[in-house]
């Protein structure tokens, strides 16, 4: 079975490098499922969960907050603004960030404040989704 080479990098580190039979990334227009042989594509990433399905069906779950995905027929490169393994996320901090963003949304006085609050809320919700996905996967 053909496999994809997968690299997830930030400006600070290479978070993941390996092979996979399937990858799901959070594109700005929705989730993209990528199999070997995918047409070349460059797309922006939104905050969300990256799922890397290994050859043995184990799953590596990562959280990304923005960046770009460069997809080639046998390779997926994610250049993320922020990337963290889901198991390393702090659920209490993500819940607190979500609550703070919701309060900021309600109290925002300008379009800039509102947009910032929306972005912070999207990131917190995406972190919580990654945590939940990783939790379900462990069962």
Swiss-Prot record:
Keywords tagged on the record: ATP synthesis, Cell inner membrane, Cell membrane, CF(1), Hydrogen ion transport, Ion transport, Membrane, Plasmid, Transport
GO MF entries: ATP binding; proton-transporting ATP synthase activity, rotational mechanism
InterPro entries reported for this sequence: ATP_F1_dsu/esu_C_sf, ATP_synth_F1_dsu/esu, ATP_synth_F1_dsu/esu_N, ATP_synth_F1_esu_C, ATPsynth_dsu/esu_N
GO cellular component: plasma membrane; proton-transporting ATP synthase complex
Pfam families: ATP-synt_DE, ATP-synt_DE_N
Chief subcellular location: membrane
Membrane topology of this protein: Peripheral membrane protein
CDD domains in the cross-refs: F1-ATPase_delta
Subcellular location: Cell inner membrane
Family recorded in the similarity comment: Belongs to the ATPase epsilon chain family.
Chain's role: Produces ATP from ADP in the presence of a proton gradient across the membrane.
Subunit structure: F-type ATPases have 2 components, CF(1) - the catalytic core - and CF(0) - the membrane proton channel. CF(1) has five subunits: alpha(3), beta(3), gamma(1), delta(1), epsilon(1). CF(0) has three main subunits: a, b and c.
Protein name per its UniProtKB record: ATP synthase epsilon chain 2
Gene from which this protein is expressed: atpC2
């Amino acid at each position: 079975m053909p496999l994809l080479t997968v690299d997830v990098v930030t400006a600070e580190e290479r978070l993941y490098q390996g092979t996979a039979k399937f990858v799901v990334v959070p594109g700005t227009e929705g989730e993209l499922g990528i199999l070997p042989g995918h047409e070349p594509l460059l797309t922006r990433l939104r905050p969300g969960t990256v799922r890397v399905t290994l050859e043995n069906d184990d799953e590596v779950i990562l959280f990304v907050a923005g960046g770009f995905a460069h997809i080639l027929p046998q390779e997926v490169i994610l250049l993320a603004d922020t990337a963290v393994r889901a198991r390393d996320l702090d659920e209490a901090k993500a819940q607190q960030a979500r609550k703070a963003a919701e309060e900021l949304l309600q109290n925002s006085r300008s379009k800039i404040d509102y947009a910032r609050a929306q972005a912070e809320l999207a990131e917190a919700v995406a972190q919580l989704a990654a945590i939940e996905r990783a939790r379900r996967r462990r069962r």
